[in-house]
Amino acid sequence: MFNEYFGGGMNGIVFQELRESRGLAYSAFADYSTTKRKEKQTNYAYTYIISQNDKMMDCIRVFNNILDTMPQSQAAFELAQQAAVKRIASQRITKANIIFSYLGNKRIGINYDLRRDIYAAMPKLTLEDIVKFEHDNMANKSWLYIILGDENNLDMKSLEKIAPVKRVATEEIFTF
């Protein structure tokens, strides 16, 4: 539900703020995920923002602001809630995904389809729950940035103010 509201699709807060409201990005997406391990629960968030080089620092500034003070919209929340419920209701686990789903659930100590619990909890969630989750898990945290682009066209001085910059050759990224 959080991903649907925050970063998923064209109605997500990240897309709306960076693309629709401000016109800073061609595309923007964010996701919060957990690993399926009972013994060691690891949570992580990732995003991608595709923009012009000259808008990069504006995108970083706006995205950090979204993370620290997430915009709240009851209308967007209701759309996200409806979309999440419909997605679970229409989603089917088939073919090889049957075993992968079973093994994933087994790793976290359950022997049934976890989506059943999520589906039942969905109507009870409120916008305040989403805001609290975001505040507790994402606001005011340190982030790792990966910037792809021609260094000659990027504002490297501004990037260096955010964090130390590590330059990586194309061959280190694409090893084939």
Model-predicted regions and their roles:
Residues 8:
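Structured mid-domain segments that build the active-site/substrate or prosthetic-cofactor binding neighborhood
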Residues 22, 65-72, 160-171:
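A common structural junction motif
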Residues 15, 127-176:
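Proteolytic maturation boundary segments
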